[in-house]
């Protein structure tokens, strides 16, 4: 099915954001695990896999619309050097992607591509949930202190 060129451009933009997130979250997961923060590492690993699932759905949709998925233009990863900075980097990445998602959803709606819109709405919901989780973790650090937070993330 021949898709709207601008829809495909939007889908590729979101795909690029997802590819950045996959790599960033995967590296952060391994860093957390290396530091003995098993709970945080496991959660971050699952976030990376979740982003990979989003990327997979986007690739399938782009191909269905007879477009070419762009996996070559990767943006910059935001890698923190300590736990709080890593959480802040992840939050910044998620927040930076929201305007792209909302613009893509609005455009898909305007041209009647409801399947792409629904896919993007599902991704938006997931990203908003992740933002909420990240904000909660940063609030916990502020409330209980970094040392107590780190201790709470050590064992499963």
Curated annotation (Swiss-Prot):
Any one cellular-component term (Gene Ontology): cytosol
Binding-site list for Fe cation 1: 18, 51, 54, 127
Domain Ferritin-like diiron residue range list: 1-145
PROSITE patterns: BACTERIOFERRITIN (PS00549), FERRITIN_LIKE (PS50905)
Catalytic activity, as annotated: 4 Fe(2+) + O2 + 4 H(+) = 4 Fe(3+) + 2 H2O; Fe(2+)(in) = Fe(2+)(out)
Cofactor entry: heme b
Keywords associated with the record: Heme, Ion transport, Iron, Iron storage, Iron transport, Metal-binding, Oxidoreductase, Transport
Entry's family note: Belongs to the bacterioferritin family.
PANTHER family: BACTERIOFERRITIN
Function: Iron-storage protein, whose ferroxidase center binds Fe(2+), oxidizes it using dioxygen to Fe(3+), and participates in the subsequent Fe(3+) oxide mineral core formation within the central cavity of the BFR protein shell.
Designated name of the protein: Bacterioferritin
Species of provenance: Azotobacter vinelandii
Taxonomic lineage of the native organism: Bacteria, Pseudomonadati, Pseudomonadota, Gammaproteobacteria, Pseudomonadales
Protein's gene: bfr
């Amino acid at each position: 099915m021949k898709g709207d060129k601008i829809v495909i451009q939007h889908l590729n933009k979101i795909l690029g954001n997802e590819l950045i997130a996959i790599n960033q979250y995967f590296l952060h997961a391994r860093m957390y695990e290396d530091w003995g923060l098993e709970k945080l590492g496991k959660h971050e690993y699952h976030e990376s896999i979740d982003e990979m699932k989003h990327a997979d759905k986007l690739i399938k949709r782009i191909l269905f619309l007879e477009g070419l998925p762009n996996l070559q233009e990767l943006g910059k990863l935001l890698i923190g050097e300590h736990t709080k900075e890593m959480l802040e980097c992840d939050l910044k990445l998620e927040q930076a992607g929201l305007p792209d998602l909302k613009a893509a959803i609005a455009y898909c709606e305007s041209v009647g591509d409801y399947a792409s819109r629904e896919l993007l709405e599902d991704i938006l919901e997931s990203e908003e949930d992740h933002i909420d989780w990240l904000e909660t973790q940063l609030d916990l650090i502020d409330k209980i202190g970094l040392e107590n937070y780190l201790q709470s993330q050590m064992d499963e």
